[in-house]
């Protein structure tokens, strides 16, 4: 896993790393004092920002991947994908990768925006690409899950599942895990794409799994959060919430944090699924949380920082009802995007 060290300016993929654990190791304990800059893009943002060095990368329904200088809030460059983009980009070394509604997945030079390679799926790619072991993994609404070579974009394998895939995968050396609209969670062999196991839930699985230790964690629209054995998919535990879950889990301090459309953020013991606490955020919680050192941050009608042990609100930045993405925390700044197309830098 490529978790950023404290104080570093790297948050290179959805939920921070290829295992999608949402763990930062930073403590954003202070209430942000104000907005350092904000910019409005031409259309809505339905993805999460990622951070690499001094550039913040944001995809948008205007069809562009935007690279924003974090010091000034001005564009460093932007790339026209030719179709709206729901996919959160992923940084791998000098590359940045993303999918789009036209079905293409592209790798660009992250400093310049120059295209390195492009590959086409048969339908939109809303999932964020995940990089592991020199391969790029992603699912598509065409019902296929793809693995391509990181350096060239050449196809490695395709697994056909005949159901739309909007879940972003998590990947480890032992497996690639993702949800599917056929109500199942899958584990594929990274080298071949062979289905190692699949586990049925009661409804669509658009949540992105997180892999930690001997557990894969994921939510389902059947109202439940699941902890599965990564080797065979057997259920360690299942926790029922009041409505469907499209939020992805985050893991830290032996707890898993996950939001539900029943307006609550839940803290559960990773080993047992026992409820530690829940807090009512007064709105449907579809954004994934992120975990700092003793702090959980989540966007829901603004951004909340909660005490990870108790769920008590430490601070809240009220920026409007349109925030349902994933905040990027550096220890000094917080970067946020909203469905109205506004990007915020708080300090």
Feature locations, PLM:
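Short, positively charged, low-complexity/disordered linker segments
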Residues: 34-36, 292-316
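General secondary-structure propensity
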Residues: 2-4, 258, 313, 317
């Amino acid at each position: 896993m490529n978790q950023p060290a404290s104080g570093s300016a790297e948050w290179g993929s959805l939920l921070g790393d290829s295992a999608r654990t949402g763990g930062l190791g930073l403590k954003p304990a202070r209430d942000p004092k104000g907005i350092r800059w904000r910019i409005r893009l031409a259309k809505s943002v339905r993805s999460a920002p990622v951070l690499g060095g001094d550039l913040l990368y944001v995809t948008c329904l205007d069809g562009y991947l935007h690279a924003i200088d974090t010091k000034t809030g001005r564009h460093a460059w932007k790339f026209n994908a030719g179709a709206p983009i729901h996919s959160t980009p992923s940084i791998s070394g000098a590359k940045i990768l993303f999918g789009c509604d036209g079905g293409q997945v592209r790798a660009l030079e992250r400093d310049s925006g120059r295209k390195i390679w492009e590959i086409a799926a048969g339908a939109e790619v809303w999932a964020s690409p995940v990089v592991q072991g020199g391969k790029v993994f992603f699912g598509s609404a065409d019902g296929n899950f793809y693995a391509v070579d990181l350096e060239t974009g050449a196809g490695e394998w395709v697994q056909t599942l005949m159901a739309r895939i909007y879940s972003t995968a998590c990947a480890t050396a032992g497996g690639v895990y993702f949800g599917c609209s056929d109500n199942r969670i899958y584990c594929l062999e990274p080298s071949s794409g062979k289905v190692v196991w699949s586990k049925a839930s009661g409804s669509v699985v658009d949540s992105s799994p997180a892999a930690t230790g001997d557990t894969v964690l994921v939510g389902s629209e059947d109202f439940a959060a699941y902890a599965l054995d990564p080797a065979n998919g057997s259920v360690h535990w299942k926790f029922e919430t009041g409505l469907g879950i499209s939020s992805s889990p985050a893991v830290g301090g032996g707890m898993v944090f996950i939001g539900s459309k029943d307006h609550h953020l839940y803290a559960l013991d990773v080993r047992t699924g026992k409820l530690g606490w829940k807090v009512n955020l007064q709105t449907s919680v579809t954004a994934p949380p992120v975990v700092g050192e003793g702090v959980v941050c989540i966007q829901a009608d603004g951004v909340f920082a909660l005490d990870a042990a108790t769920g008590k609100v430490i601070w809240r930045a009220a920026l409007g009802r349109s925030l349902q993405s994933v905040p990027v925390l550096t220890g000094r700044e917080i970067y946020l995007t909203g469905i109205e197309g506004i990007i915020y830098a708080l300090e």
